[in-house]
């Protein structure tokens, strides 16, 4: 799920914290990519006639095709990707995982009805809702990455937290994922849409953490509390408090503890035994492998191994796999030239021209910051 409504909130309140970029501008950059999120995208997007790709044996291959060609696209543009795989989920995520299981059950029932009614569009929609990344998908992608010469990391817990750790400690330039909670984990730079297909023509969105805090006028602790109020994977949020109210409350009262002292809990019911403090600790002190203990090594692809696995075992065209291997090898030696700015000190918050909201526009940052002092207070 990530953080509910955070991307829109940033667009409304901190537009200068994000800029759009082209993939070619990341030449020479190392990027830690959330593997599970990418594989999920591939399983949903890489399809034929609305169905997941399979080989002659009926095995799903959408994830392998997506991983192979999207990774080649990145490497071809000089990017050095490292994929980070999820470990065991934290105990606090059990509630969110249970909700996802319930939603899949509902989608399965809806799919059966749509199939009976012959509603093709609904069938396609509910099929996608049933998609789940399995251990087998992960294992097959790890094998493929090894043959491609691309490193991967097994996170002890959440992949987003591990990506943030690698970025914060300078092991990579940025964390690449669609889950906004990588910002809550404190990554200095986040990239969205990096693994999207070229055909979608979606620009890469680059978010800067330091600039985000500055434009929101929040500390790291206040930003984490804001994300918990918006809704995260680790606990429920307060019903009735959306993004607009959440940021106003955090700006006014500075912490969830103070907010709880002042809001009308009849109007805004607080979840029973709300473990917001445990969620906060999880974001501040996630279980990760320290960046200095992670070794990243990019090597030449194993062309023979790729042909054996992808063509002979999985049914992909041998010529296409060989062409892909050549692209990987050529691009790897080109990208070793590196970036000019790698020889100089890199500033944590690049100079980005701030996108000022239109003059007099509703919801400008200055207007959002002003509020009635007793707006959310308990009735006397």
Swiss-Prot record:
Residues holding DNA: 47, 70, 158, 231, 233
Superkingdom to which the source organism belongs: Eukaryota
Modification comment: Phosphorylated. Phosphorylation upon DNA damage induces relocalization to the nuclear plasma.
Residues where Mg(2+) 2 binds: 179, 181, 233
Record-level GO cellular component terms: mitochondrion; nucleolus; nucleoplasm; nucleus
One of the GO BP terms on file: base-excision repair
Cofactor: Mg(2+)
Region (N-domain): 1-104
Broad class of where this protein is predominantly found: nucleus
Annotated stretches, region: Interaction with PCNA: 336-344
Stretches with biased composition (Basic residues): 365-380
I-domain: region residues: 122-253
Keyword match Electron transport: no
Ranges where the record places region Disordered: 328-380
Name of one Pfam family that matches: XPG_I
InterPro entries, alphabetized: 5-3_exonuclease_C_sf, Flap_endonuc, HhH2, PIN-like_dom_sf, XPG-I_dom, XPG/Rad2, XPG_CS, XPG_DNA_repair_N
Subcellular location: Nucleus, Nucleolus; Nucleus, Nucleoplasm; Mitochondrion
Binding, Mg(2+) 1: 34, 86, 158, 160
Gene3D superfamilies: 5' to 3' exonuclease, C-terminal subdomain, 5'-nuclease
UniProt enzyme class: hydrolase
Subunit structure: Interacts with PCNA. Three molecules of FEN1 bind to one PCNA trimer with each molecule binding to one PCNA monomer. PCNA stimulates the nuclease activity without altering cleavage specificity.
UniProt record similarity statement: Belongs to the XPG/RAD2 endonuclease family. FEN1 subfamily.
Name of the protein this chain belongs to: Flap endonuclease 1
């Amino acid at each position: 799920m990530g953080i509910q409504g955070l991307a829109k909130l940033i667009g409304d309140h901190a537009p200068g914290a994000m800029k759009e970029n082209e993939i070619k501008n990341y030449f020479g950059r190392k990027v830690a990519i959330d593997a599970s999120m990418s594989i999920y995208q591939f399983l949903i997007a890489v399809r034929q006639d609305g169905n997941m790709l399979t080989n002659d044996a009926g095995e799903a291959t959408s994830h392998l095709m997506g991983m192979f060609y999207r990774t080649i696209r990145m490497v071809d543009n000089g990017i050095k990707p490292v994929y980070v795989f999820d470990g065991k989920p934290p105990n606090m995520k059990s509630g969110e995982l249970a909700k996802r299981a319930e939603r899949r059950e509902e989608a399965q029932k809806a799919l059966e009805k749509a199939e009976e009614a012959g509603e093709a569009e609904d069938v396609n929609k509910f099929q996608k809702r049933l998609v789940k990344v399995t251990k087998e998908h992960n294992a097959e992608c790890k094998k493929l990455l090894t043959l491609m010469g691309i490193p991967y990391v097994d996170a002890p817990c959440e992949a987003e937290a591990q990506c943030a750790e690698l970025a914060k400690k300078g092991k990579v330039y940025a964390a690449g994922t669609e889950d906004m909670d990588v910002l809550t984990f404190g990554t200095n730079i986040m990239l969205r849409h990096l693994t999207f297909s070229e055909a979608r023509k979606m620009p890469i969105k680059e978010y800067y953490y330091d600039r985000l805090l500055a434009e929101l006028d929040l500390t790291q602790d206040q930003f984490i509390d804001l994300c918990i109020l918006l809704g995260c994977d680790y606990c429920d949020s307060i019903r009735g408090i959306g993004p607009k109210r959440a940021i106003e409350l955090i700006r006014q009262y500075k912490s969830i503890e103070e907010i709880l002292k002042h809001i009308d809990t009849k109007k805004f019911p607080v979840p029973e035994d709300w473990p917001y403090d445990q969620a906060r600790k999880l974001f501040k002190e996630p279980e990760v492998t320290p960046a200095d203990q992670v070794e990243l090594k990019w090597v030449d692809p194993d062309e023979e191994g790729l042909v054996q696995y992808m063509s002979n075992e999985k049914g992909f065209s041998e010529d296409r796999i060989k062409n892909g291997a050549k692209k990987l090898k050529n691009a790897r030696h080109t990208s070793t030239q590196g970036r000019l700015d790698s020889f100089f000190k890199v500033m944590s918050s690049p100079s980005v021209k701030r996108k000022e909201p239109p003059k007099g526009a509703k919801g400008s940052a200055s207007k959002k910051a002003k509020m009635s002092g007793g707006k959310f207070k308990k009735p006397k």
